[in-house]
Design a protein with these regions (language model features):
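Membrane-inserting effector segments that mediate pore formation, membrane fusion
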Residues: 4-64
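Acidic-enriched, low-complexity/disordered segments with a strong bias for Aspartate over Glutamate
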Residues: 12, 29, 35-36, 55, ...
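The feature marks long, low-complexity, polar/acidic/proline-rich intrinsically disordered regions embedded
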Residues: 16, 47-61, 73, 81-84, ...
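Membrane-proximal, non-transmembrane interface segments of integral membrane proteins
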Residues: 55-124
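Long, helix-rich, hydrophobic modules that act as membrane-proximal anchors or helical bundle/coiled-coil regulators
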Residues: 94-203
Length: 203
């Protein structure tokens, strides 16, 4: 499956945008008429007895992902795709498809869509797009809402802090030598990657 080709295919994109947010049962009925849609039609083997629920979930997440860049000019999307050589095109498409397919929540697809939009607008580069989407894929979405609490150095050290730190969104402002000896002190503060994600989340 190629999310870039789906984005560029008028038939596929229209199908995803129109039907991707439907409930499974309704979607399964509509899909019976989708055999002429190039990429989505091939994803769902229509000869199967039942629609694969995971594939349905992928199309649903793809809907929320694409919604975020719907208002971006086609020229910007073309410019982004044309900037990729064959190797990077395959690598980035494979990673983005995997991250989107394995995302556990629709909200993650929405946030990945916002990250992709930032890339199309030239606000971040390819590697930062992949880094941020990878963080979103692995994170518990509600934890990301707590990033604002670390704009200023925060001594709080709980499971949310641990999660955000492990995802590379916080930096530890180390304690003084005496405090390290006593195993106390130290404050967490959002780093550059975390600030980028915060900004994108606000959009």
């Amino acid at each position: 499956m190629n999310i870039f080709e789906i984005q560029q295919s008028k038939q596929d994109k229209e199908f995803v945008m129109k039907n991707g947010s439907l409930e499974f049962e309704v979607f399964a009925d509509i899909l019976k008429t989708a055999d002429d849609i190039p990429y989505i039609g091939s994803l769902f083997k229509l000869s199967k007895v039942a629609v694969n629920y995971m594939d349905y979930r992928f199309v649903r997440k793809l809907h929320f992902f694409l919604v975020e860049s719907e208002n971006i000019e086609p020229e910007r999307k073309e410019k982004f795709l044309n900037s990729l050589d064959e190797k990077d095109y395959k690598r980035i498409n494979a990673m983005m498809t995997h991250l989107l397919y394995s995302a556990g929540e629709d909200g993650k697809a929405t946030l990945m869509g916002k990250i992709y939009r930032s890339r199309l607008l030239g606000e971040i580069d390819d590697e930062m797009m992949l880094r941020l989407c990878s963080v979103v894929n692995r994170a518990f979405l509600a934890d990301l809402e707590h990033l604002e609490e670390y704009v200023k150095p925060n001594p709080e050290d709980n499971y949310i802090t641990s999660n955000l730190y492990s995802f590379g969104l916080l930096r530890l402002k180390g304690p003084e030598v005496v405090e390290r000896t006593l195993n106390v002190g130290g404050q967490y503060e959002v780093n550059e990657v975390g600030r980028l994600l915060m900004r994108i989340m606000r959009e």
